[in-house]
């Protein structure tokens, strides 16, 4: 009987220690939306809106094709960042566009807030993705790339190089 009680106490203490240890990262269950041609901005906004709709128990109704038609600029060949912000505000979101840092990603993801970031790979155009998670032990970013796939892993060094090339542009959108 004593051995069994000691084993139970040891298990409880180990379980509690495991819970108190820092988790290796964070991942948010953001709905994935793929893009139409030049539609990474609309798809990224749709992912953020659907995430918050799901959090509120509402139907996920963000229509990416309507957003693309509404926001697309032939002059830019895509969607301006200011138009993403304006559209989100019109839909009842508070927006905060900042020149982000790694700690900003960690801070907001830990609070359950996914982010849209702009990336620029090489000489290519700007590309919007949704940062849905981080693994800070392995220095990995988990991003939803509307032109690629859900939860695409990218090493921090590569991510930060592409993010820096886009001015570290970061957009936080939260429901009002």
What are these regions (language model features)?
Residues 19-31, 49, 61-176:
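Conserved active-site-adjacent core of cysteine acyl-enzyme catalytic domains
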Residues 5-16:
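Bacterial N-terminal signal peptides
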Residues 15-23, 53-56:
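Short alpha-helical hairpin
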Residues 27-56:
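N-terminal targeting signals for Sec/Tat export/insertion, comprising classic cleavable signal peptides
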């Amino acid at each position: 009987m004593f051995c069994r009680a000691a084993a139970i106490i040891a298990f409880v203490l180990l379980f509690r220690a495991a819970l108190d240890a820092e988790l290796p990262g964070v991942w948010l269950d953001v709905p994935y939306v793929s893009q139409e041609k030049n539609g990474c901005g609309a798809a990224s906004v749709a992912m953020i809106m659907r995430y918050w709709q799901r959090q509120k128990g509402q139907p996920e109704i963000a229509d990416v094709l309507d957003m693309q038609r509404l926001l697309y600029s032939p002059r830019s060949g895509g969607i301006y960042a200011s138009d993403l912000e304006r559209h989100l505000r019109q839909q009842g979101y508070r927006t905060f566009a900042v020149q982000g840092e790694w700690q900003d990603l960690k801070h907001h993801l830990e609070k359950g807030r996914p982010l849209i970031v702009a990336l620029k790979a090489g000489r290519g155009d700007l590309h919007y993705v949704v940062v849905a998670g981080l693994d800070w032990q392995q220095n990995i970013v988990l991003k939803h790339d509307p032109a690629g796939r859900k939860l695409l892993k990218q090493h921090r060094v590569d991510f930060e190089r592409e993010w820096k090339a886009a001015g570290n542009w970061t957009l936080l959108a939260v429901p009002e």
